[in-house]
């Protein structure tokens, strides 16, 4: 009997999912991406060598693991092919391991142009997108006008749809945003080149997943971004354009929720956020700078500096509920080494002094102040610890208090960037 495990982020992304997926794929037959696009950036460190993945599932570095991209992922063919070539230059046989649903929506040049034009027009009110066309591609999908990978293999039909789409989007680009139009013939020629390279990678991912399930294989689902960036449950409108929570698995891969056995929520031992939007525990002092420097807090996709703050138990409790989390993985514990005291946000206080629960949209965060519980820090190093007993008593107390506050067990603790720098208390595939 196989197990089907989900790994997803519980904060605003950048929680360290890539390392944990790579660690757990030792037990998996397949790793599946089910939402997002190449706005994700998953960093893996194996024997000191760093690899950053954007579209391809993190299981690609494991021999014998099949990597699947489900229908919920928006695919930029140029970005995908660049990533494939980069990995192949390292000797990784990507094309043997990777298969893609033909139902994936395409991200094309006009999506990127629209994304960047909108952010530019918003000025100081920009959302902080990666500018890679993710949102506009999902818009086309929901409006039922988008092109999908499967359309690439029918030239005449594709050309007709592309012409209609460009008429529509170029009108907005030129007349509203005062940006140059996207050329039809250039776009069509590029897409036909992509078609030849992508055709061998096509697979009915949904059917393949259910065949594996019936055969008792272990399957892992890899989330991108974090729960608080979910289009429905995140800090709207400062969110991404897909469902980053566990519900996105069913829609983004065709694998029903009753088949899932364990949902692992990844959370940092502190909190970070990239781009605009509410962040109640954000630090603007020396501690914030310390966390950013020690944690190397720069986006794997954009290179942008991440905002840093104290651990927020309020948002984690919400993420645990909306994802039905089975257990947590606490990452970057070692970044807290050397801090004299550590704060945990246990609630929010409004201007009247009343303590309230997590708001449901960005505007509702205005005027809220974090309520902190202070804990002693530790001077000893936790870097590379492989057992709970190796951790300082204060670090163990911090872990226990987090569990108590959020109501979920911490089953895995990451104590460094390498896959071996990990404490596994309960294995998701166990």
From Swiss-Prot:
Q: Quick one: where is this thing mainly located?
A: cytoplasm
What EC number(s) has UniProt assigned to this enzyme? 6.3.4.4
What molecular function does GO assign, one term?
adenylosuccinate synthase activity
Alphabetical list of Pfam families matching this protein: Adenylsucc_synt (PF00709)
Q: In which pathway does it act?
A: Purine metabolism; AMP biosynthesis via de novo pathway; AMP from IMP: step 1/2
Cystine pairs annotated here are none
Keywords, sorted A to Z? Cytoplasm, GTP-binding, Ligase, Magnesium, Metal-binding, Nucleotide-binding, Purine biosynthesis
EC main group: ligase
One Gene Ontology term of the biological-process aspect is: IMP metabolic process
Residues reported in the UniProt entry to bind Mg(2+)? 14, 41
Q: Which residues does the annotation say bind IMP?
A: 14-17, 39-42, 130, 144, 225, 240, 304
* Residues annotated as catalytic: 14 (proton acceptor), 42 (proton donor)
Q: Does the keyword Nucleotide-binding apply?
A: yes
Residues that bind GTP: 13-19, 41-43, 306, 332-334, 414-416
PROSITE patterns referenced in this protein's UniProt entry, alphabetically: ADENYLOSUCCIN_SYN_1, ADENYLOSUCCIN_SYN_2
Q: How is the cofactor bound?
A: Binds 1 Mg(2+) ion per subunit.
Q: A Gene Ontology CC term for this entry?
A: cytoplasm
Q: Does the keyword Ribonucleoprotein apply?
A: no
What this protein needs as a cofactor is: Mg(2+)
Q: Which family does it belong to?
A: Belongs to the adenylosuccinate synthetase family.
Q: What name does this protein carry?
A: Adenylosuccinate synthetase
